[in-house]
């Protein structure tokens, strides 16, 4: 039996806004620098291969890194030392955006050209497809350039349907729609390009990129509060509950605590042959090494603690 989608009404969100806490990042010059250094030439590509518009990066439980880019082998796997392992499902992708890994090491991708979200097993078999391949739309069976995907403890799936639709859709673990929220705008619960999404416990963090804020909701889409910390391109939450936010406009990565305070900043390395720091998305491994995906420089990088 189909599940009726329950859209949260804007009037409810507006009422919540009067009591919500809004955080601003002030005195940015006092943010401590994160003590990282770039690892030169970490990713060892096969002869003749190169990255193109690197949009996504993720790390699995073995320390293997997935790089999602817009070249002829869009999804590439590397081992913990940076050695190339394989490319996965070359013919499935149109325009790479985000790659994520869930608690069972399944691989999830969002594709802004194909308008789909895919779940693949660790060996690369497609287990679930959300949306309709190459068919955009604004109902619950379609996406319009989905930007990111996240999962809660129950296995429910949350999709930021951001480039074409300003909304979040929630599905159960079988891919059946449960609820959705959001519309174009700048008010609480509204979005102007929800570009990233991450979940920590019972909280859903949405990177509302063009409104230059992170909005925080409960698992049912109820607006709680927001933080204004720049333009959130990518979000990643570590096991110790720090939120890492990449901002490709400012060319930096922020480390944010649970109160919404920026407690560290990585401004990136000096420009390499004119290529500026452009962190579109990011991931952090168990050793707190940082990995970045950069669209304009066609680059993926690893940063290690000094």
Where do the PLM segments sit?
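Bacterial N-terminal signal peptides that target proteins for export
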Residues: 1-12
